[in-house]
A protein has these predicted regions:
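Tandem repeat scaffolds
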Residues: 3-209
Length: 209
């Protein structure tokens, strides 16, 4: 099957305007930068056709969040709770996603490039045409994800958890890890290089001589 690449956000000169967190708000055609909304909670926030740059939302909780055709650039979303969110045609570029929780979210046509996502959780997510490239995904969670057209390129995957995730057709070869958690019954069809195969085998308790 030919690999598809995510559709990047198509933004036509978003208007610089105020951005803030408030329940039931929808922002469309917006550009905002250099704002801090950490330690807040917001429900049913919607972003469309928007660019957010250097926005900080540490330990913020966004419930039932929805965004489409959005660029997040140089943002700090460390420990942000994005549970059960919806992300369509979204690009995270050079963002800090340390401990960010995407659990149970739906992501389609999403790109993560040059992000620091150590301890981030994508557990129980639905990923369709999603690309991670040059990201730090150390100790990240990809537990029991449902994926189609997932691409991983030059990421650091040491300590990442892929338990109960079917891996048939997933290509790890350009990524690096010295330990990784996989379910043996779901490893059929996983594409790895020789060094990675030895690392995985050692993790399963095999003694290689």
């Amino acid at each position: 099957m030919k690999k598809k690449t995510p559709i990047k956000p198509q933004l036509t000169e978003p208007v610089t305007s105020d951005f803030y967190l408030e329940d039931e708000m929808m922002f469309e055609g917006l550009s905002a930068s250099n704002l801090d909304y950490s330690y807040l909670t917001c429900n049913n926030l919607i972003l469309r056709d928007t660019k957010l740059e250097r926005i900080t939302m540490q330990k913020t909780r966004l419930e039932r969040f929805e965004c489409s055709n959005v660029l997040f650039k140089n943002c700090d979303f460390s420990n942000l709770e994005w549970l059960a969110g919806s992300f369509h045609q979204v690009w995270f570029d050079q963002c800090k996603l340390i401990g960010t929780n995407f659990a149970e979210s739906f992501l389609r046509d999403c790109t993560f490039s040059n992000c620091v996502a150590t301890f981030a959780s994508f557990s129980n997510t639905n990923l369709k045409t999603v690309d991670f490239s040059d990201c730090q995904l150390v100790d990240s969670e990809f537990y029991e994800i449902n994926w189609k057209q997932l691409t991983l390129t030059k990421n650091k995957l040491t300590g990442s958890n892929w338990f109960r995730t079917p891996l048939n057709g997933l290509d790890f070869t350009t990524n690096t890890f010295d330990k990784i958690a996989l379910s043996q019954e779901h490893m059929t069809g996983l594409i790895v290089n020789q060094e990675q195969a030895l690392t995985i085998a050692a993790g399963l308790g095999l003694v290689i001589v």
